């Protein structure tokens, strides 16, 4: 994924991210009110992303009865979002507004790398959640993942994410090449962080591959899983309505799946503008007006980073006990286990047998 900030009115050697331009004209500078608005928006996302995901992680890990497959994957998703909040937002905002990199060569390589790892882990955490829901509802008598499987899956997706992101670490460089032919004193000793791929074709292939691996492919798979789930639940509810009143159980099942699907939809909508922006700009630099590039980039990037807040927001709105524990969290109170009345979001303990039109329950899900 291409997270580099591209600038205007200054040619770059062909071997550095392919004829990228840099802004040296004051006419292209963002107005102060716009900078203030962007900084305020980024700050709000950082605060919400940090506090929300940190609270969600602590609350789930603190409660033993919440340590099931779905919640383990939710914690992994929140940790990935937390990492993105720390590594993506502040560095990208400062870099884009300053038009040069001030954080050194190590952070230049790590910033690109960690951002790519984070989004890969996030989407594949959603894939694993979809698989768990699919097996639970579509094939309840077959194989179902347990906590050990969830931990193994998390290890695999982190390894896969790191492998996919390695080219960004390899080819991210700190260079002053773009500023060497500029006579302005303000650009002396300034550096930019760019992706220096060996060939333009390699960069385009890699960017397109990441779009498929990080966005299109996983979302298509998730869509198929949840479509099958909702069709099965609809048929099951129709059967149960004819036999007995099971409105409470049906509403709980519906609420849980709506929450999980909302997280997926939120992720997809937030990241779509950013992926489109990168693809369009990578394949045709002239498609984006030079003076509008930085503003469009920041808006698309900010929209993508809002996804780091989606997880705790949807989890909180649709889980009453999370709201209650969240109040304890911000009041620095101790969390105490409530085994009798604690609501868990996962249905991993529920066993269903649709063929006999019965519902057997090993332990409460709510």
Curated annotation (Swiss-Prot):
It is a multi-pass membrane protein. Keywords: Cell membrane, Disulfide bond, G-protein coupled receptor, Glycoprotein, Lipoprotein, Membrane, Palmitate, Phosphoprotein, Receptor, Transducer, Transmembrane, Transmembrane helix. GO terms for cellular component: neuron projection; plasma membrane. A lipid is attached at residue 333 (S-palmitoyl cysteine). It is found in: Cell membrane. Residues 1-39, 104-111, 171-203, 282-294 are extracellular. The keyword Transmembrane helix applies. The keyword Transmembrane helix applies. GO terms for molecular function: neuropeptide binding; neuropeptide receptor activity; neuropeptide Y receptor activity. Residues 61-82, 133-149, 225-260, 316-366 are cytoplasmic. Pfam families: 7tm_1. The chain crosses the membrane at residues 40-60, 83-103, 112-132, 150-170, 204-224, 261-281, 295-315. Disulfide bonds join 108-193. InterPro entries: GPCR_Rhodpsn (IPR000276), GPCR_Rhodpsn_7TM (IPR017452), NPY1_rcpt (IPR000351), NPY_rcpt (IPR000611). Glycans are attached at residues 2, 9, 15, 181. Belongs to the G-protein coupled receptor 1 family. Receptor for neuropeptide Y and peptide YY. This is Neuropeptide Y receptor type 1. It comes from Xenopus laevis. The lineage of its organism: Eukaryota, Metazoa, Chordata, Craniata, Vertebrata.
């Amino acid at each position: 994924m291409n997270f580099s900030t591209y600038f205007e009115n200054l040619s770059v050697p062909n071997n550095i991210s392919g004829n990228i331009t840099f802004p040296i004209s004051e006419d292209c500078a963002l107005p102060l009110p716009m900078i203030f608005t962007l900084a305020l928006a980024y700050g709000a996302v950082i605060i919400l992303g940090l506090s929300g995901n940190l609270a969600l992680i602590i609350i789930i890990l603190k409660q033993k009865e919440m340590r099931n497959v779905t919640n383990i994957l939710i914690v992994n998703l929140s940790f990935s979002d937390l990492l993105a909040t720390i590594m993506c937002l502040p560095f990208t905002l400062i870099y884009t507004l300053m038009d040069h990199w001030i954080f050194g060569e190590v952070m230049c390589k790590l910033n690109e790398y960690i951002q790519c790892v984070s989004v890969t882990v996030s989407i594949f955490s959603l894939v694993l959640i979809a698989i768990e829901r699919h097996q639970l509802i579509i094939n309840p008598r077959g194989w179902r993942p347990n906590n050990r499987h969830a931990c193994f899956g998390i290890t695999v997706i982190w390894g896969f994410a790191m492998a996919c992101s390695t080219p960004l670490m390899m080819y991210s460089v700190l260079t002053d090449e773009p500023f060497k032919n500029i006579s302005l004193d303000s650009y002396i000793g300034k550096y930019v962080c760019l992706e220096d791929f060996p060939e333009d074709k390699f960069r385009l292939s890699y960017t397109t591959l990441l779009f498929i691996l990080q966005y299109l492919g996983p979302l298509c798979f998730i869509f198929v899983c949840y479509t099958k789930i909702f069709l099965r639940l609809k048929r099951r509810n129709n059967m149960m309505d004819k036999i007995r009143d099971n409105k409470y159980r049906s509403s709980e099942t519906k609420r849980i799946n709506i929450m999980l699907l909302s997280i997926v939809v939120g992720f997809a909508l937030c990241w779509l503008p950013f992926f489109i922006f990168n693809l369009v700009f990578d394949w045709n630099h002239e498609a984006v007006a030079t003076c509008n590039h930085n503003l469009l980039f920041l808006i698309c990037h900010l929209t993508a980073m809002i996804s780091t807040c989606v997880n705790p927001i949807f989890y909180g709105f649709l889980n009453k006990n999370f709201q209650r524990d969240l109040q304890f969290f911000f009041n620095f109170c101790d969390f105490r286990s409530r085994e009798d009345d604690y609501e868990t979001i996962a249905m991993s303990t529920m066993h269903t047998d649709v063929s006999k039109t019965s519902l057997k329950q090993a332990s409460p899900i709510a």
